[in-house]
């Protein structure tokens, strides 16, 4: 077939597709919104934003955060919610575990009055609510806490000893098939928290696995493995956890990077502590003995005092953070970008006003 005949055949096929499935059902890459810059929401941790390679968690994607108990999974998700709310976003929390503490969420910076919360009875109900929120296009971040608590209706209505092999895995697989297209279209960030289980009889390799089957592993664009690696002490009192997060899967940047940060009890991720450490590493903050200095001005003796000084001077903390992000070539401090549906509504209202 000659080149001109090929082009004619392709043009005919494209016009037929558009006629049958609607305008925009197929187009060239440079004509689509796919080419737009990836929009991200900060995780609340500067180090983790850098490890993700794009400055935060990508919008329009599925993210899985898993780890052992008390490793900081819920804290990390609440920090993401707080960051999205700071930028004017709407967030929803599907609390399948019935364990969300509004007081703790408030301490992490979450605007509890503006947070949509659902405590569903069954796994089907939880995922249906999630799907309806995504399709509305009005929610920017949805957290599902957790996959392990998404109990199928058949299991709830059955007897305690009944066997329900693969029921939860089938539920997750079906839900994710429905969700992913809508998530991309509405530019929503959906985060699934997951727990760890042990595979019985594994002699070699890692015996750990996550609940809910394999579907989430495939559909997730980013998977984060979060672990508690130590305790933070002030005299004899433990005031927080040292935490390590490994990016085990990343479809938007190179994977397998990791970040370490402090989670302080009642405060969340210590952003100021990260700014000091990364500022010293990038030579934006000077360290001489126990003293820290910025632009020739001493900001504190010891990390705790320097952290306190930055907390009292947020403008300087933001200035140092901006320098670190610029040096690493990642964003994450940009203005909030509305979803495609919100943008369309805004342009329609502008046309109407004119």
Swiss-Prot record:
<comment type="function">
    <text>Can catalyze the hydrolysis of ATP in the presence of single-stranded DNA, the ATP-dependent uptake of single-stranded DNA by duplex DNA, and the ATP-dependent hybridization of homologous single-stranded DNAs. It interacts with LexA causing its activation and leading to its autocatalytic cleavage.</text>
</comment>
<dbReference type="GO" id="GO:0006310">
    <property type="term" value="P:DNA recombination"/>
</dbReference>
<dbReference type="InterPro" id="IPR013765">
    <property type="entry name" value="DNA_recomb/repair_RecA"/>
</dbReference>
<dbReference type="Pfam" id="PF21096">
    <property type="entry name" value="RecA_C"/>
</dbReference>
<dbReference type="InterPro" id="IPR020588">
    <property type="entry name" value="RecA_ATP-bd"/>
</dbReference>
<feature type="region of interest" description="Disordered">
    <location>
        <begin position="333"/>
        <end position="354"/>
    </location>
</feature>
<dbReference type="GO" id="GO:0005524">
    <property type="term" value="F:ATP binding"/>
</dbReference>
<protein>
    <recommendedName>
        <fullName>Protein RecA</fullName>
    </recommendedName>
</protein>
<keyword id="KW-0963">Cytoplasm</keyword>
<dbReference type="Pfam" id="PF00154">
    <property type="entry name" value="RecA"/>
</dbReference>
<keyword id="KW-0067">ATP-binding</keyword>
<feature type="binding site">
    <location>
        <begin position="67"/>
        <end position="74"/>
    </location>
    <ligand>
        <name>ATP</name>
    </ligand>
</feature>
<dbReference type="GO" id="GO:0005829">
    <property type="term" value="C:cytosol"/>
</dbReference>
<keyword id="KW-0234">DNA repair</keyword>
<dbReference type="GO" id="GO:0016887">
    <property type="term" value="F:ATP hydrolysis activity"/>
</dbReference>
<dbReference type="InterPro" id="IPR003593">
    <property type="entry name" value="AAA+_ATPase"/>
</dbReference>
<comment type="similarity">
    <text>Belongs to the RecA family.</text>
</comment>
<dbReference type="InterPro" id="IPR027417">
    <property type="entry name" value="P-loop_NTPase"/>
</dbReference>
<dbReference type="GO" id="GO:0003697">
    <property type="term" value="F:single-stranded DNA binding"/>
</dbReference>
<keyword id="KW-0547">Nucleotide-binding</keyword>
<dbReference type="GO" id="GO:0003684">
    <property type="term" value="F:damaged DNA binding"/>
</dbReference>
<keyword id="KW-0238">DNA-binding</keyword>
<keyword id="KW-0233">DNA recombination</keyword>
<keyword id="KW-0227">DNA damage</keyword>
<dbReference type="GO" id="GO:0009432">
    <property type="term" value="P:SOS response"/>
</dbReference>
<dbReference type="InterPro" id="IPR049261">
    <property type="entry name" value="RecA-like_C"/>
</dbReference>
<dbReference type="InterPro" id="IPR023400">
    <property type="entry name" value="RecA_C_sf"/>
</dbReference>
<dbReference type="GO" id="GO:0140664">
    <property type="term" value="F:ATP-dependent DNA damage sensor activity"/>
</dbReference>
<dbReference type="GO" id="GO:0006281">
    <property type="term" value="P:DNA repair"/>
</dbReference>
<dbReference type="InterPro" id="IPR020584">
    <property type="entry name" value="DNA_recomb/repair_RecA_CS"/>
</dbReference>
<dbReference type="InterPro" id="IPR049428">
    <property type="entry name" value="RecA-like_N"/>
</dbReference>
<dbReference type="InterPro" id="IPR020587">
    <property type="entry name" value="RecA_monomer-monomer_interface"/>
</dbReference>
<keyword id="KW-0742">SOS response</keyword>
